[in-house]
Design a protein with these regions (language model features):
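Structured, solvent-exposed hinge/loop segments at the ends of secondary-structure elements
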Residues: 49-179, 186-194, 247, 259
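Mid-to-C-terminal secondary-structure elements
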Residues: 1-5, 9, 134-150, 162-295
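Intracellular coupling helices
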Residues: 21-37, 41, 314-357
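Hydrophobic membrane-insertion alpha-helices, especially the h-region
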Residues: 39-53
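Generic structural signal for small/hydrophobic residues in well-ordered secondary structure
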Residues: 28, 38, 59, 75, ...
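Selective detector of the "anchor" transmembrane alpha-helix that sits immediately C-terminal
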Residues: 300-321
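Membrane-helix entry/capping segments
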Residues: 2-9, 13, 17-21, 26-34, ...
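Small-residue-rich transmembrane alpha-helices
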Residues: 47, 274, 355-382
Length: 382
């Protein structure tokens, strides 16, 4: 599009621009219906193309906003040919994290978020809130490298600590600093949470949600091998091989003590481990207890192909409309030749006409894209 506009500008400088524009507006007046159909057809094609490409880009860049995303891995349990699961127990995760110096940091996240009811006190007045919270171990801030606006990557080290997304902090505390403020639970048996940090909101295409992250109790299921209820992520050193990390763990971990004397890694009725890079988790399917957003690479490839087919069809349509008008425009073109217009000027006017119609259709499609999210047709939950 930009190349076409640039080319037309160069051509126009060498041609009679006044004549070209006069011919262009004359065509619009004479063939109003055809011009409107051309513009609408192209603009709808542009809208469809851009909407599809936005979705494709959304999924292909999922979790790419995290620094060193390719060095972050989720550890899944594989049950032979029976499938796999995304959750793990805390002592197993602790043993894995400490098994190799190649693992820079590890963290656990509860498999599901929960709603928390709390209130804050300000000048003797109580204001109640209900917000989603995710119970995590302190290492989450270092594995995923939260962009901390207040506080640091050690903000969850102490019990009853929480970090808030910027949007939530502004909603609750306005322009005041949130650090040090208490979130008092509606449950009198639960200790108040203390805000220790504020992080910049994650983009929508991230597995991490813009919720309150609460520090997991150090005693919670610490040695409980029967509670498999956590997502487990590790961050490896730059250039480290995940296969080497897995082999090292399997060689040194006393699996028989944990799972029984008959346990063997990778056996049909036994367990195995799988490390999946953070961006690939989005495309990993058929994993039990995996509540993270999913997409299919095959579906995205189909969408990508459809987007370009739409553009090609729109181009063919545009050409057909222009060709259909040729018999009605022959007289006008011959008249211009008689009046002295050169072939170059006539070709230039046709080129300007095509580019102007395309440019106007493109601008109209941008207007449609601006309006669509404000209509009931837009899916607010997407």
């Amino acid at each position: 599009m930009l190349f076409g506009i640039f080319f037309v500008i160069i051509e126009a400088k060498q041609l009679d621009m006044k004549t070209i524009l006069r011919n262009f507006f004359s065509v619009l007046r004479r063939f109003k219906t055809a011009s409107v159909l051309n513009v609408l057809g192209l603009s709808i094609a542009f809208v469809a193309f851009m909407l599809i490409m936005m979705q494709v880009n959304y999924d292909y860049t999922f979790d790419r906003s995290h620094p060193n995303a390719d060095a972050i891995f989720r550890v899944d349990i594989v049950h032979g040919s029976k499938g796999s699961q995304a959750i793990i127990c805390r002592p197993f995760a602790r043993a894995f994290t400490g098994s190799s110096p190649l693992i820079e940091e590890g963290c656990l996240l509860s498999a599901w978020t929960e709603s928390r009811f709390f209130y804050i006190e300000d000048g003797g007045q109580r204001t109640s809130y209900k917000e989603d919270a995710w119970n995590v171990t302190p290492g989450v801030l270092e594995v995923f490298r939260f962009d901390m606006l207040e506080g640091s990557e050690r903000s969850l080290d102490e019990p009853n600590s929480v970090v808030l997304p910027e949007s939530m902090a502004r909603k609750i505390f306005g322009d005041e600093s949130a650090v040090g403020k208490q979130l008092i639970s509606a449950n009198p048996m639960e200790d108040a949470k203390i805000v220790k940090g504020v992080y910049k909101d994650f983009p929508r295409n991230s597995a991490l949600k813009n919720v309150m992250y609460t520090s997991m109790s150090p005693k919670e299921n610490y040695d409980n091998w029967g509670n498999w209820n956590y997502f487990f992520f590790v961050r490896l050193g730059e250039g480290m091989d995940k296969a080497e990390v897995l082999d090292n763990f399997k060689r040194n971990f006393n699996a028989k003590e944990a799972f029984g004397n008959e346990f063997e890694w990778g056996e049909e009725n036994s367990l195995d481990l799988r490390l999946t890079s953070l961006p690939d988790v989005h495309f990993l399917s058929n994993v039990d207890f995996d509540s993270m957003p999913k997409a299919s690479r095959q579906t995205l490839l189909v969408l990508f192909s459809i987007a370009f087919v739409i553009l090609i069809i729109a181009g063919i349509n545009f050409t057909n409309f222009s060709t259909a008008l040729t018999p009605m425009r022959i007289k006008s073109i011959n008249t211009q030749k008689v009046l002295g217009s050169s072939d170059r000027t006539l070709r230039g006017s046709l080129l300007v006409e095509a580019v102007c119609v395309s440019l106007f259709a493109y601008l109209l499609s941008l207007l449609f894209l601006y309006i669509i999210p404000k209509t009931p047709c837009s899916s607010q939950g997407a």
